[in-house]
Structure formats: C-alpha cells, structure tokens
Amino acid sequence: MANPVQLFRRNSSWQKGVIRSLATDIIIHGRITTTEARAKILRSYVDKLITQAKTDTLASRRRAASFLRNIQLKDGKTSLQYLFASVGPKYKDRNGGYTRIIKLPNRQGDNSKMSIIELV
C-alpha cells in the first residue's frame, strides 16, 4: 500500500502545485476529469476552501488567496473573487460535502483509474 502522504510518488512541491492547480480549476469550471487518487486528495482541499468562502472575512480571503492560483476569468473577476462571490454563498446552508466523485472507465493508454470530481 502506498504511503498516503506521498501518494503521487513525487516531491512535496510538485504535489502542492498540482493540487493548487486542480483546486483552482474545479472552483472555476465546477467539474474536472482526473485520476481517482488525485480526486480523493483534492476533495478535502476544495471542501476546506468552500467552507472558508462561506465566512467572507479578510482572514479567510487571505487564507484562500495563499492557496488558489490567481487566474483572471472572462468576466474580469479573479478566481478568488469568484470563489467568495459565487461559490461560497451557493453553499451557505450546506454543512460539508460540497464535492462528488463519479468513477469513469480506466484510461486507455495506461489503464489508470479515472473519475470526475464536481461541485454538488
């Protein structure tokens, strides 16, 4: 069994970069297709980001800004502004469980377990 801390078998800076990019993508797009291992790790990070976005304070904005990538959207907002203006209020009455993982058939090239992770 693989060490859960080092699930990707890469160094920690690479893991953090991949998780940050995937978390930003799921906040912006609402759903992404990735491997099952990445989706399971990503779920906890996205849930924590949305929980912080529900309480719109300066401290929670700074905490989320330290993790999310600063991507400019088409409507002029950044990914952080979108998280706090659209995603956070959407889940105001929900206590956790903001994401869903749907399993897909294995990838054809290397037979990796694939899944879709999406916001509920």
From Swiss-Prot:
SUPFAM superfamilies: Prokaryotic ribosomal protein L17 (SSF64263)
Entries under PROSITE patterns matching the protein: RIBOSOMAL_L17 (PS01167)
Biological process, per Gene Ontology: translation
GO cellular component: cytosolic large ribosomal subunit
Pfam families: Ribosomal_L17 (PF01196)
InterPro entries on file: Ribosomal_bL17, Ribosomal_bL17_CS, Ribosomal_bL17_sf
GO MF, any single term: structural constituent of ribosome
Keywords of the record: Ribonucleoprotein, Ribosomal protein
Keyword Ribosomal protein: yes
Keyword Metal-binding belongs to the record: no
Subunit structure: Part of the 50S ribosomal subunit. Contacts protein L32.
Similarity remark: Belongs to the bacterial ribosomal protein bL17 family.
The protein, known as: Large ribosomal subunit protein bL17
Gene symbol of the encoding locus: rplQ
